Design a protein with these regions (language model features):
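Active-site-proximal cap/loop segments of hydrolase catalytic domains
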Residues: 1-177
Length: 177
């Protein structure tokens, strides 16, 4: 369990527990959205290219049969509760962590409806969230997208976590203070 590892690091005194961030893309986006629906330990989260609703994802993504065959016991129309219970969207009301959602507009592996839907659900509930869409980019934006968009993506992520995790800069001191 990821929280067991985190607890071990915390117990050693290596980190400030008030400034924890979490994030991931694709499968990591699934894990991040699931994690922040289970705990409020994190001060900021990045959910990138997520799958948050496995039922809809199963019928619209490019690997549409994969999840039904390998992760679930049947198709979503035959086993809707299994899909819902394992989908991070069902935990959205519990989220207390500010969330940055990043989605590529040409992503067929985790189509836009997943990231946009998650963002919309957070906003409908009054949760702090920001959505960034990258046009003409695919699921591989972080590795092989247009260089300008890869740089922009990293700047957005850095800004998001810097604002939420780092202490504010100290006020300048003048001579005689």
């Amino acid at each position: 369990d990821l929280m067991v590892v985190l607890d071990s690091v915390i117990a050693r005194g290596y980190i400030d527990i008030t400034r924890l961030g979490v994030g991931g893309g694709s499968g990591g986006g699934v894990l991040t959205s699931w994690t922040i629906g289970q705990t409020d330990r994190f001060a900021a989260a990045l959910v990138e290219r997520p799958v948050v609703d496995f039922a809809s994802h199963t019928v619209v993504a490019d690997l549409n049969g994969f999840f039904a065959q390998h992760w679930f016991h049947d198709y979503p129309w035959r086993s809707p509760l299994e899909y819902f219970d394992r989908s991070p969207i069902n935990l959205v009301e519990r989220v207390k962590t500010p969330v940055l959602v990043i989605q590529s507009e040409q992503d067929y592996r985790t189509p836009m409806d997943q990231g946009i839907g998650y963002y919309n659900a957070l906003r409908m509930l009054g949760k702090p969230a920001k959505l960034v869409l990258f046009p003409a980019s695919s699921h591989g934006l972080s590795r092989n997208g247009p260089p300008s968009q890869r740089v922009e993506r990293l700047a957005i992520i850095l800004d998001w976590f810097t604002r939420r995790l780092l202490p504010p800069p100290a006020a300048p001191r003048s001579a005689g203070d």
